Amino acid sequence: MNFLAHLHLAHLADSSLPGNLMADFVRGNPQGDYPAEIIDGIYMHRRIDVMTDNLAEVKEAREWFRPQTRRVAPITLDVMWDHFLSQHWAQLSPDLPLDEFVRYAERQIVPILPDSPPRFVNLNQYLWSERWLERYREMDFIQRVLNGMASRRPRLEALRDSWQDLDTHYDRLETQFWRFYPQMMRLAENKQL
């Protein structure tokens, strides 16, 4: 899961949106560094990551990547799940349009930025102003995201080429998304994540 899915599941679970979004920028034990609700959100994010990585549907999808891109498949798939969520948002969350949800999430997160890790603050400078969460529905933007990550981290250079795997297996990946994401939503709504 990437930014949009973590925020969506946090919302469904009545969990901290800031904590869930911030989790990838917090190393180790967050106890004592943040308020309890943010810590709970950080831990929820971590549980979702472990659960998603171990889903049969996700493991199967990783195998569709070519040997030269399989190492970065988990990262590529996280971004792709956000693409499908953004694209099918109206069907998955009909009572709350995506643009309204994004504004709601931004209002929850921006106030905590002064007490946040610098890299998280930096992310937020672009996430909201460039409307990343809404733009995930555009495959051109997904390619830009993968290229951007590859540019910032040379060891992730294979992300650029993983675009071809997404293009080749697009329909199969979409089917996988529908096989697991609605279940994740139910778990969130039932406070089981």
Swiss-Prot record:
Annotated GO biological processes are: fatty acid biosynthetic process
* Keyword Lipid biosynthesis tagged: yes
Task: Give the catalytic activity.
Answer: holo-[ACP] + H2O = apo-[ACP] + (R)-4'-phosphopantetheine + H(+)
Keywords of the record: Fatty acid biosynthesis, Fatty acid metabolism, Hydrolase, Lipid biosynthesis, Lipid metabolism
Pfam families in the cross-refs: ACP_PD
Q: Which Enzyme Commission number(s) are listed?
A: 3.1.4.14
Q: Does the keyword Lipid metabolism apply?
A: yes
Q: Name one GO molecular function term.
A: [acyl-carrier-protein] phosphodiesterase activity
The protein's matches in PANTHER family, at most eight in alphabetical order, are given as: ACYL CARRIER PROTEIN PHOSPHODIESTERASE (PTHR38764:SF1)
* Family according to the record: Belongs to the AcpH family.
The function of this protein is: Converts holo-ACP to apo-ACP by hydrolytic cleavage of the phosphopantetheine prosthetic group from ACP.
Q: What is this protein called?
A: Acyl carrier protein phosphodiesterase
